[in-house]
């Protein structure tokens, strides 16, 4: 957003227009009117920071209207060089409306810069009652303003710090909410072949729907911590720096001093703690270990590329950053692994790198398959449950899932891919099976230790990852009844595509992530 300096004449003209709009709403609806603007010092009244904070303020007002059962008869908003403006004609007692506005102004970090005037039926503004403190020194604000104690630059800098902090806290909480919502939505998608859903426990005997709910609840703080890890790491490395440094400057410093691999290293101990929290919540059952890794890395990647002015980065930037964070560590550690986990054992036996390799490659299964397929299904009119169930089939048909490989061996994993492909591409299944489902022989136990696992994986991905457009245009949409029948077959064979379930959760998370407020 380009910042533009305005003149005193423009400020006065905008003020007159606001009064005219307020009076017009009062006359038309005969109810109290809220006039919402931002208190921005200096000649620049509209910035990227103020615009994002203003949008958040509107969200808070709408939530307050709903919670208090206030009826909004009219709403108008506009973004001008003189600042953002919003007007609400609210059918409620003016005193109650003012109380709501004061509560928002005082409870929100950004609220110090909110100017939520309430105009009563007599055309007069209701007073706050308690004077607001100065944003720079904390003394009574009117005294500082009348005596010009602080320069406009000082007030502007203090205001920017407030907005940056407020937007960081808001977006950190939003990341946690969206990640938790994605986990709950994923387990709720029904039917899912071999997986826990609302209908049954899939091929599992040690977990059920409530296990996943308990696990998701236990992980709520983890996602926020991952998003904020960059700030925490920077704070440790830069103790003793000038406390007046703005969050924006600190972000620039972080990108210069903390590498992607170092961010990943900082994430690992809190990921281990999240696993312990999950096990404590589920009685020792592993419900979300894969998601703790994958979504945790993504939340950390978002935190690395987040700015208060721009908000969340694009999906491509997030996935590229996740790859940069994990690739170096994977290349160093996986060949030297001690085979303590099932994934490491499968790497030694078949050369498959599992979810760690998928993340290190930038999650191509999500970028090229599941996310475009899911959005295409929604565009075709499917509800989110059906769209997600179909998306899961595309993942099963196109991803080398180590959970399937662990439970069913090469033959079981190949069978699962074939069945999913048959539902999606029945007319050309025989041809597609040869092209997109690697034969069991390609996953035979590795005997040549000189074979490059990464090259082998990339070779398979060229086959397993057809263009999303081809997937969408060439496939049919299986019914929920057909998917439920496949669920029964997976359960009978004790197969569970847990890796694909994690990728579905990632898909739902990224789809819900706003790239701008």
Locations of the language-model features?
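Long, contiguous binding/interaction regions
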Residues: 1-64, 96-99, 103-122, 126-168
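Intrinsic disorder/low-complexity segments
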Residues: 1, 230-258, 425-477
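Short, well-structured hydrophobic secondary-structure segments
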Residues: 33-91, 207-212, 217-230
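Phosphate-rich cofactor/ligand-interacting catalytic cores and adjacent structured alpha/beta frameworks
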Residues: 161-229, 264, 302-425, 468, ...
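A generic, well-ordered mixed alpha/beta core segment in the N-terminal half of proteins
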Residues: 102, 106-109, 273-277, 293-321
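A short glycine/serine-rich beta->alpha loop
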Residues: 276-289, 379, 488-497
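Short, amphipathic C-terminal "tail helix"
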Residues: 492, 496-517
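Long, hydrophobic/aromatic-enriched structural stretches that serve as scaffold segments
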Residues: 224-232, 258-304
């Amino acid at each position: 957003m380009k910042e533009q300096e305005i003149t005193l004449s423009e400020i006065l003209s905008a003020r007159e227009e606001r009064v005219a709009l307020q009076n017009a709403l009062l006359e038309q609806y005969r109810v109290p009117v809220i006039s919402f603007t931002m208190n921005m010092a200096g000649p620049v009244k509209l910035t990227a920071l103020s615009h994002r904070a203003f949008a958040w303020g509107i969200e808070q007002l709408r939530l307050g209207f709903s919670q208090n059962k206030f009826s909004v008869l009219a709403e108008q908003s506009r973004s001008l060089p003189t600042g953002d403006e919003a007007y609400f004609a609210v059918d409620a007692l003016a005193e109650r409306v003012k109380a709501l506005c004061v509560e928002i102004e005082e409870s929100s970090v950004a609220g110090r810069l909110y100017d939520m005037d309430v105009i009563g039926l007599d055309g007069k503004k209701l007073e706050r009652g308690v004077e607001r403190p100065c944003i720079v020194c904390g003394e009574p604000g009117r005294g500082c303003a009348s005596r010009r104690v602080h320069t406009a630059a000082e007030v502007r800098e203090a205001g920017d710090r407030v907005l940056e902090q407020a937007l960081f806290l808001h977006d950190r909480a939003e990341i946690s909410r969206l990640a938790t919502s994605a986990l709950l939505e994923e387990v709720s998608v029904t039917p899912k072949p071999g997986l826990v859903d609302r209908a049954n426990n899939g091929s599992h005997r040690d977990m059920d729907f409530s296990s996943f709910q308990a696990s998701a609840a236990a992980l709520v703080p983890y996602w926020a911590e991952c998003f904020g890890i960059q700030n925490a790491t920077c704070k440790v490395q830069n103790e003793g720096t000038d406390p007046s440094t703005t969050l924006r400057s600190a972000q620039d410093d972080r990108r210069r001093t903390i590498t992607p691999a170092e961010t990943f290293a900082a994430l690992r101990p809190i990921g281990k703690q999240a696993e312990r929290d999950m096990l404590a919540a589920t009685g020792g059952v592993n419900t979300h270990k894969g998601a703790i890794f994958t979504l945790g890395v993504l939340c950390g990647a978002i935190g690395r590329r987040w700015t208060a002015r721009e908000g969340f980065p694009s999906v491509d930037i997030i996935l590229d950053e996740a790859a940069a964070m994990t690739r170096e560590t994977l290349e160093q550690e996986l060949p030297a692994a001690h085979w303590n986990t099932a994934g490491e054992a499968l790497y030694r036996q078949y050369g498959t790198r599992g979810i760690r390799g998928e993340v290190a490659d930038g999650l191509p299964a999500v970028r090229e398959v599941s996310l475009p397929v899911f959005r295409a299904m929604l565009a075709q009119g499917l509800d989110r449950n059906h769209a997600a169930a179909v998306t899961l089939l595309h993942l099963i048909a196109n991803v080398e899932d180590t959970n399937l490989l662990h439970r069913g061996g090469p033959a079981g994993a190949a069978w699962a891919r074939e069945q999913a492909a048959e539902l999606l591409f029945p007319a050309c299944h025989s041809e597609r099976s040869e092209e997109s489902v690697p034969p069991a022989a390609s996953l035979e136990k590795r005997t040549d230790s000189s074979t490059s696992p990464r090259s082998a994986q990339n070779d398979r991905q060229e086959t397993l990852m057809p263009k999303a457009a081809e997937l969408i245009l060439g496939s049919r949409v299986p019914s929920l009844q057909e998917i439920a029948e496949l669920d029964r077959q997976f359960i009978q064979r004790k197969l569970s595509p847990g890796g694909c379930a994690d990728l579905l959760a990632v898909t739902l998370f990224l789809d819900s992530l706003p790239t701008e407020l």
